Amino acid sequence: MIKFLSALILLLVTTAAQAERIRDLTSVQGVRQNSLIGYGLVVGLDGTGDQTTQTPFTTQTLNNMLSQLGITVPTGTNMQLKNVAAVMVTASLPPFGRQGQTIDVVVSSMGNAKSLRGGTLLMTPLKGVDSQVYALAQGNILVGGAGASAGGSSVQVNQLNGGRITNGAVIERELPSQFGVGNTLNLQLNDEDFSMAQQIADTINRVRGYGSATALDARTIQVRVPSGNSSQVRFLADIQNMQVNVTPQDAKVVINSRTGSVVMNREVTLDSCAVAQGNLSVTVNRQANVSQPDTPFGGGQTVVTPQTQIDLRQSGGSLQSVRSSARLNNVVRALNALGATPMDLMSILQSMQSAGCLRAKLEII
């Protein structure tokens, strides 16, 4: 009996708290990606490029590029091009990116090109927010979509006006890093939580000694580290692999008002309640009636009189009981028993929370 109770208590503790590495819960402050952007031209399209008469910036960009190559286009020349498209190029400069390292780029059409499939991006400088060039992008574009048209009919799968170039940009300038400067580093929690921040600080202090870590707020833990890059790398690697018992998350229900999707975590519980959901539909039908005089020469006029009919219908509305549920599968089963659509479920959950029956935070995005 004692062994059974001990095993049961161990099972409950294991279920309530799950050990995770600090590296999965936090990130190092200052170690982040930086966005890059550039404007360029895609050539080699199979007649699916910009209509240059409607996108003058494409022609202007092409003239500037040709002039840099020593080719002069006579003034007033109306170039009817179909194989060129103006695009925006975006990329992310990774932390500690070094010269010569390659990164992926995303190419997106900004004109009226029909497709970028089969195109080649010409050399495009990628700049940061400080207007400095950090990378150069060039290469063949990979487009995931496909399309065909004939006889006025067309079929398209996925999107054709954007694509990627794997390893399509080369880093030319390194971003200065403050890593290794100073004797402290800040760890930032992925989700703010006072108890988790303090628990991580206590775990580091138990292993590295009291005073090694301090929880500054619900998201930031300050860690004292040895000076020097190599020493900080080893110290940080040891800290990130430490195990922390993760307490149960806050009960939360997330509702997407645009798509009607409802997502909830396993901490959501329901109290007993009764729910009545009625659907009210209003139909307005307007029809124009023409009234003409009976005698052709009686001096009457033809009059158009609108006739409007409004139909009001209400369905459902029966009161249904929802039992108290403490497990996620029971919560899902209880909500499915209502037979409500996702859009109806959003209003039901809001009403449940207002009545105190939904034990969770309700977040609408």
From Swiss-Prot:
Record-linked Pfam families: FlgI
GO function terms (MF aspect): structural molecule activity
Subcellular compartments: Periplasm; Bacterial flagellum basal body
Function: Assembles around the rod to form the L-ring and probably protects the motor/basal body from shearing forces during rotation.
CC terms in the record's Gene Ontology section: bacterial-type flagellum basal body, distal rod, P ring; outer membrane-bounded periplasmic space
Signal peptide annotation: 1-19
Highest taxon of source: Bacteria
PANTHER family, per the entry: FLAGELLAR P-RING PERIPLASMIC PROTEIN FLGI, FLAGELLAR P-RING PROTEIN
Stored NCBIfam families: PRK05303.1
Family membership: Belongs to the FlgI family.
Species of the source: Shigella boydii serotype 4 (strain Sb227)
GO biological-process terms attached to the record: bacterial-type flagellum-dependent cell motility
InterPro entries: Flag_FlgI
Primary location: periplasm
Quaternary context: The basal body constitutes a major portion of the flagellar organelle and consists of four rings (L,P,S, and M) mounted on a central rod.
Protein name: Flagellar P-ring protein
UniProt KW keywords: Bacterial flagellum, Periplasm, Signal
